[in-house]
């Protein structure tokens, strides 16, 4: 999301591993509200590309630490264990609370328009539609749009339907069909 070519597995850094400004960071500096929704861990490569700067996409604990101090107004997805079951024993949920986030680690609840909102509700990723996920993607998207609307500012929202890609890699046509239909809601 930087617009610059880099090396395989890099997140938000140049070929020389120098941090590059992401589109989310650029828009935030211009007064936009920002949001990320993912069916996988919020520290996974696609969402991380919008706020993190690391040499390797599997540096989930470092990516979570960067998210805890990033300027993201609304986030929803999985990855709970990278915030509270860390090798360094840091509690990044406390960091989010200290930064005035409305935080829910159990469910997608109602956002609060006067706060930043974080819904990190699974240890890793959410289940696929074929595994019974329900309407998380639709509900998270609607909640984010409601939040942004209440604040009446321009916004940037990245919504990732992770399982469309994963279903393709697995050659699982049923998963892909259900995930595309879910994303289309």
Regions found by a protein language model. Name each.
Residues 1-63, 72:
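Active-site nucleophile/metal-coordination loop of metallo-enzymes that catalyze phosphate/sulfate
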Residues 4-7, 34, 40-44, 80-84, ...:
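Solvent-exposed loop/turn segments at secondary-structure junctions
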Residues 16-23, 59-63, 68, 72, ...:
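Stable alpha-helical elements in mature extracytoplasmic
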Residues 29-35, 70-74, 99-102, 114-116, ...:
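Loop/turn elements at helix/coil->beta-strand transitions in domains of secreted/extracellular proteins
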Residues 45-50, 123-132, 150-185:
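Active-site His/acidic residue clusters
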Residues 51-78, 97-106:
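Acidic, His- and aromatic-enriched active-site or binding-groove loops in soluble protein domains
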Residues 75-128, 133-134:
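Long, well-ordered, tryptophan-enriched scaffold segments
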Residues 106-120, 140-162:
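Active-site regions of oxyanion-processing enzymes, predominantly non-cytosolic
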């Amino acid at each position: 999301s930087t617009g610059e070519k880099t090396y395989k597995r890099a997140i938000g850094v140049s070929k020389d591993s120098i941090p590059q400004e992401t589109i989310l960071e650029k828009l935030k500096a211009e007064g936009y509200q920002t949001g990320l929704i993912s069916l996988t861990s919020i520290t996974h490569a696609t969402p991380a590309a919008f706020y993190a700067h690391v040499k390797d996409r599997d540096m989930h604990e470092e990516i979570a630490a960067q998210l805890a101090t990033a300027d993201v107004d609304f986030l929803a997805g999985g990855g709970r264990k990278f915030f509270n079951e860390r090798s360094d024993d840091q509690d990044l949920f406390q960091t989010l609370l200290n930064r005035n986030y409305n935080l829910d680690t159990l469910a997608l609840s109602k956002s609060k328009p006067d706060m930043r909102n974080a819904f990190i509700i699974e240890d890793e990723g959410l289940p696929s539609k074929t595994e019974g996920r329900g309407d998380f993607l639709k509900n998270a998207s609607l909640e984010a749009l409601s939040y942004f609307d209440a604040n009446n500012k321009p916004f940037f929202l990245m919504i990732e339907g992770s399982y469309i890609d994963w279903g393709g890699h697995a050659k699982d046509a049923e998963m892909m069909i259900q995930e595309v239909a879910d994303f289309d809601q």
